[in-house]
Amino acid sequence: MDALRKEAVYTIEDIYALPDGERAELIDGKIYYMAPPNTKHQRLVHFFDREIGNYIQRKNGKCEVFPAPFAVFLNENHTNYVEPDISVICDPDKITDKGCNGAPDWIIEIVASGNKSMDYFTKLFKYRTAGVREYWIVDPAKKMITVYRFEKETMEEYSFDEKVPVGIYEDFSIKVQ
C-alpha cells in the first residue's frame, strides 16, 4: 500500500529565505510565486494609489493606502502572507514596520494573465474569511471591476467607464481612466 504523500507546509520564514528579488505569496502554507507586473498593471496600481491617497488626504482621514509590495499577514499562524496590489488600512494598530497584521479594510487586486484563479477564487475566499471588508478585482483585459462588500454580502460588476462607489466611504467613487 502506498503511503499518502503529504504536501510541504511552508511558513513566513520560507518567504523570508527566498533569494533577493524573488517575490511570492503564502496561502494556507503553500507558496505562490509572482511574476513581475507589466506596465498596464503598474499604471493601474499607481492610479488607484493616487486616487485613494488623494481622497484620504482631502478628508483628513485616518486610513492609509499601501501599494505593493506591502506585506499583509492575514493571521497569526505564519502560513498566510500576501502582497495585495492596493491595501487600505484604517486601524493604525494593525500597521507595523513589517507591514499589516490582520485584514486590511479594503484590498484591490489587479488581474494578470497568469494569476486569474488566484484573484477570483483563492484570494476571494481567503480575504473574506480573514475579515477584509471590501475586495475589488480589477480585470484590465475585460475592462471590468468586480466589487465584493463582504459585510453586506454583495457582489457587483462595473465597467471601466462607470463610477464605482467605494463601500468603506459614503462619498467616494472611482472611475478608471
Positions of the model-derived regions?
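Gly/Pro/Ser/Thr-rich low-complexity, intrinsically disordered segments predominantly at protein N-termini
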Residues: 1-177
